[in-house]
From Swiss-Prot:
Any one biological process term the GO annotation gives: single fertilization
Name the record gives this protein: Carbohydrate-binding protein AQN-1
The family this protein is said to belong to: Belongs to the spermadhesin family.
InterPro entries registered for this protein in UniProt: CUB_dom (IPR000859), Sperma_CUB_dom_sf (IPR035914), Spermadhesin (IPR000124)
Listed GO MF terms: heparin binding
SUPFAM superfamilies in alphabetical order: Spermadhesin, CUB domain
Amino acid sequence: AQNKGPHKCGGVLRNYSGRISTYEGPKTDCIWTILAKPGSRVFVAIPYLNLACGKEYVEVQDGLPGAGNYGKLCSGIGLTYQSSSNALSIKYSRTAGHSASSFDIYYYGDS
């Protein structure tokens, strides 16, 4: 079940809205790319983030993977981001041997 639904490690998400959740498998880096319709923007909300700082982080990238980002996040409440185009990427990274902390990231595109 680790490669299905919101618990998958990375991939391209084309749904209008959805959720990215904790990945607990063996990979240490996961990148999700959210693609909205051309001309639309992507909105991301992280209601609560409490990762083990120094051992794991989430990075919100404004565009395709490798685009400019808003920094490495390991904690926060009520975090929101908006893309400048129809693409936004989320990277999750953790140190090998460190078990993943739980998180939920919600996204949606404007129509």
